[in-house]
């Protein structure tokens, strides 16, 4: 048996060589936020809402209209009028300027409502980006772990082949059992199966990475979460989430939008006051031969006295929409708190599990070394050594699961507190961060 190789595999139970590549998790997240169609779609929605807000502000700017026309005009005067019938080619043009002065603050509230809508979509964009970053972290960790498991599986198969070679020599020389050889052959078949599964899992994780990030992995490095962004207590974490989580900010902006919508609906209870100025030019119009001009400058008041009760019904409808938005805000607080506590518990239990699994790896490694020494003095068989080697292989896989679960749990907590993008040092476009004022 190649005992030096066996010792290396046993004593270095947690040392797995990972190739040095340049693509960090932070780079993968940045690339995803730049190219992922879901994020681009969310940004387009935000940009659209910004233009809706710009459009609503136009209602408080002057409106200038040009009206022009040419056509036939025939006039048949009454009998009392001395002149006869007239047939003219009527020509006219007018320019009208209208400036809104006051409309019960309906336009002002509409401007604020559309701004609140845009702000809500902006925070939703940040929430989507944070969730997408967490998704990238998951597939990134899975891909790195898959490579480590593949290396474990390769080393495990190599150890099985070494032991098989030694037992085969012993059987050939007549001092070994063919039953032992058959049993090792079965173990080798299983080791081959583990290797094939590891290869398939590595391929799957790379495929998912490519779909999400937009390019194939250029090489992945085990990431370490910045623990400065992990609160010390769950209560501190909840307070941070209430302040920073974009989902809560979405709910708050939605309440503001509903509030402005309700106020806007009550603007119809008041008159609309505007200034209108116009200049009109006519030629051969109204039965008069020749040109005539008309200039107007008016302060107008329009007041709807009755509208079949529709305005009252609309106001009542928007009042209930406001109550609905407040209920959704409360639901957002509860959902964020629930998600945070689940993430916190997952991290706490994963840390505990990792400690136990680390002890398991250490004990299994020491057992293999002890069995090796006992084999040399005839107290153990190679099958005994192989059994402990299999236990060590499974222990190392379990530890890897816990190791990567711990990192992902940390990222989950950061996402649940609304700090994941900051923790990853991801620079999002400035327009994602600029508040829409209202």
Label each region the model flagged.
Residues 90-92, 138, 183, 236, ...:
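Transmembrane beta-barrel architecture of outer-membrane proteins
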Residues 40, 63-88, 98-127, 249, ...:
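Small/polar (Gly/Ser/Thr/Ala-rich) solvent-exposed segments
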Residues 1-10:
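Bacterial N-terminal signal peptides that target proteins for export
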Residues 8, 131-242, 343-346, 350, ...:
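Periplasmic alpha-helical coiled-coil/stalk elements that build and connect Gram-negative outer-membrane
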Residues 74, 398-438:
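Acidic, low-complexity, intrinsically disordered peripheral segments
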Residues 21-69, 101, 177, 216-256, ...:
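Bacterial Sec-pathway N-terminal export signals of envelope proteins
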Residues 41-56, 128, 132-152, 162, ...:
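Amphipathic alpha-helical coiled-coil segments
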